[in-house]
């Protein structure tokens, strides 16, 4: 594997952790997905390679395949400090057709199948809109553990829709492309889709643990597996709180390694989500990116991450979001394999063209993942990761080869 010399121009310290740079330059492997992590023995960070994405899926069928795309009907083989956000987005319309279909849901965590969930459906639709992006909508900010939001933002709140949120549901599909060098082990990412509980989630294990003999994919898959269990428990008695789900899952996860996490739930008061690290999600409405979760990093390529115990970041360090959604919205959740290689405009463009062509969520997720992979191996095109590296004082150009997970949800009226 070829390496690219990444020269460090301005070494800095952030958040009390010295960034790891040998002298004034270091060898940075463009295809390794190298990322910093907390070490087992202390809070000192070491630069280690990160990779891919492995799905933990609420409606899944176990398969030996590594590259997977799913519609909730079959399945096989990163950003700022914590806070609470309330997002109000304009009304949008997208006509979705409906196709009934019932089958049992199973969670697939790489090679392990978890307890059945409930029912599933697949809805499909079309949309024809132009592509553009807009600034973040009105929002409120507060600590993640404070579920009541503070007033904030400078834009006026858009009018609310007359459509009852209780009549909305998520129709989700996913696609996963592992790092070519990690296909044998399935990579380090995990994700889930819980159709009945209206929840999705992604996690990106920090692959640098492989240097000390640890498969971080075990941590991310266990974290997502326990997240599904926590979602099922909450679904039986009360509304689902993504932060509580992540806290419970983190407390139960004992595997070695570390991981980012993003959990999204559709509830009666809108879309509720928590994001910790450099995975994230985007909300697209009428050809517009109305929201993208900000990156949580202690420094460049130094993502927030959960680890067994409390030696790294904790769930409450994540950002909590409450977002108004409308029928016709498209939600894209992904690991940094997506967001390091695709700009907002590119993701939105794929969503618009895919829905216009009548693709279901699985098809849209596949298109996003495929474009991200194309960008990842293109050394002549500027990428979000390259932009961030350059802003941090490194000489870097091209994409970043990594595991890629894309989970796409259509918001539709039931």
Curated annotation (Swiss-Prot):
Q: Which Pfam families match?
A: PP2C_2 (PF13672)
The cofactor binding remark recorded in the entry reads: Binds 2 magnesium or manganese ions per subunit.
Which residues are involved in binding Mn(2+) 2?
204, 336, 402
What is the catalytic activity of this protein?
Answer: O-phospho-L-seryl-[protein] + H2O = L-seryl-[protein] + phosphate; O-phospho-L-threonyl-[protein] + H2O = L-threonyl-[protein] + phosphate
Please give the cofactor(s) recorded in the UniProt entry for this protein: Mg(2+); Mn(2+)
| EC id | 3.1.3.16
Q: What class of enzyme is it?
A: hydrolase
Domain PPM-type phosphatase: from-to ranges:
174-411
Q: Which UniProt keywords apply?
A: Hydrolase, Magnesium, Manganese, Metal-binding, Protein phosphatase
User: Binding of Mn(2+) 1: at which residues?
Assistant: 204-205
Query: InterPro entries in the record, alphabetically?
Result: PPM-type-like_dom_sf, PPM-type_phosphatase-like_dom, PPTC7
- Determine the domain of life of the protein's source: Eukaryota
Q: Which GO terms describe its cellular component?
A: chloroplast; chloroplast stroma
**Gene Ontology terms, MF aspect:** metal ion binding; protein serine/threonine phosphatase activity
Provide the family line. Belongs to the PP2C family.
* Designated name of the protein: Probable protein phosphatase 2C 80
